[in-house]
């Protein structure tokens, strides 16, 4: 984590985009100084910048059993924000496992970091573990972009990822809350969610989401369903009408006006117009007797 932190914040790299400003090397060295202490669990709070919103209870239980057998090999990382109050920077799963074991204290490395640094380290630490859901990962990318005023391309370079990877994840954040919740709960996959993006219409997106869950549609079936909906939504093309010459329009209007005059005189005139490729046909019926 130290290498990641150094790379992101410019420690030892003056050219880094993330270099901390107006700090001496002594101040930087002080920040990364590690001090391990046994801290009461009741004095520790989760990281407010934690991108992970879903913790697998079964995996926490497995981790707790491992810690019970082998001990906590890697201490959690915290920062002090008040007297005897600490916030987790990294290691919330280990913290939860220790709590489950009933420990009163937990070994912790104390770092002196500000809010921006704490958020960045927490986000990067979780991103590198590759255990986040697609939505949690997207939220982490968005927070890093906002914290450091980065473009998607710049963030991709810093994280060693493709720009398209970042862009595809961020698009998920535009989906309705119900779909994002389904992703978090793993009711649908990331590919299902991405397939819903072209629909645009939220009502349609939620309708297809319901179909995916209820009918257990795979990604291919989902894409086919969405393609059909998009096709149905396209405006129907009107049959191309052939251009009608001005003289023809005048002739047709003259006939219609004449028929109206006859009808106005009291005669019951019936007429029917038909259009063919090469001509118009008007059939007129005038009764012999009034």
UniProtKB/Swiss-Prot annotation:
InterPro entries: Chromosome_partition/occlusion, HTH_ParB/Spo0J, Nucleoid_occlusion_protein, ParB/RepB/Spo0J, ParB/Sulfiredoxin_dom, ParB/Sulfiredoxin_sf
Biological processes, Gene Ontology terms: chromosome segregation; division septum assembly; positive regulation of sporulation resulting in formation of a cellular spore
Pfam families: HTH_ParB, ParBc
CC terms in the record's Gene Ontology section: chromosome; cytoplasm; nucleoid
Domain of life: Bacteria
Keyword list, A-Z: Cell cycle, Cell division, Cytoplasm, DNA-binding, Septation
Single Gene Ontology MF annotation: DNA binding
DNA-binding positions: 153-172
CDD domains on file: SPO0J_N
Subcellular location per the Swiss-Prot or TrEMBL entry: Cytoplasm, Nucleoid
Principal subcellular localisation of the protein: cytoplasm
NCBIfam families: nucleoid_noc, parB_part
PANTHER family per record: CHROMOSOME-PARTITIONING PROTEIN PARB-RELATED, NUCLEOID OCCLUSION PROTEIN
Function according to Swiss-Prot or TrEMBL: Effects nucleoid occlusion by binding relatively nonspecifically to DNA and preventing the assembly of the division machinery in the vicinity of the nucleoid, especially under conditions that disturb the cell cycle. It helps to coordinate cell division and chromosome segregation by preventing the formation of the Z ring through the nucleoid, which would cause chromosome breakage.
Protein family: Belongs to the ParB family.
HAMAP family: ParB_Noc (MF_02015)
Protein name: Nucleoid occlusion protein
Species of provenance: Bacillus cereus (strain 03BB102)
Gene: noc
């Amino acid at each position: 984590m130290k290498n990641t932190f150094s790379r992101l914040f410019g420690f030892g790299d003056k050219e880094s985009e993330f270099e901390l400003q107006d700090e001496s090397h002594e101040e930087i060295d002080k920040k990364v100084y590690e001090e391990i202490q046994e801290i009461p669990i009741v004095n520790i709070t989760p990281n407010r910048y934690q991108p992970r919103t879903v913790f697998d209870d079964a995996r926490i239980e497995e981790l707790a059993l491992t810690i019970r057998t082998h001990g906590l090999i890697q201490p959690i990382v915290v920062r002090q924000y008040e007297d005897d109050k600490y916030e987790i920077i990294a290691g919330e799963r280990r913290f939860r496992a220790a709590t489950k074991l009933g420990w009163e204290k937990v070994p912790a490395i104390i770092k002196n970091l500000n809010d921006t640094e704490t958020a960045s380290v927490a986000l990067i630490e979780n991103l590198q573990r590759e255990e986040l859901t697609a939505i949690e990962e997207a939220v982490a990318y968005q927070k890093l972009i906002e914290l450091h005023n980065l473009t998607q391309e710049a963030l991709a370079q810093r994280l060693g990822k493709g720009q398209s990877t970042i862009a595809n994840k961020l698009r998920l954040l535009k989906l309705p809350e119900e779909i994002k919740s389904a992703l978090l709960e793993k009711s649908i996959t990331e590919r299902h969610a991405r397939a819903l993006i072209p629909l645009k219409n939220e009502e349609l997106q939620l309708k297809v989401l319901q179909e995916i869950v209820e009918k257990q549609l795979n990604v291919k079936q989902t894409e086919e369903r969405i393609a059909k909906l998009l096709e149905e939504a396209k405006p129907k093309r009107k049959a191309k009408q052939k251009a009608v010459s001005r003289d023809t329009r005048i002739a047709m209007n003259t006939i219609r006006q004449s028929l109206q005059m006859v009808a106005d005189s009291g005669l019951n005139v019936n007429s029917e117009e038909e259009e063919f490729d090469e001509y118009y046909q008007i059939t007129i019926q005038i009764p012999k007797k009034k």
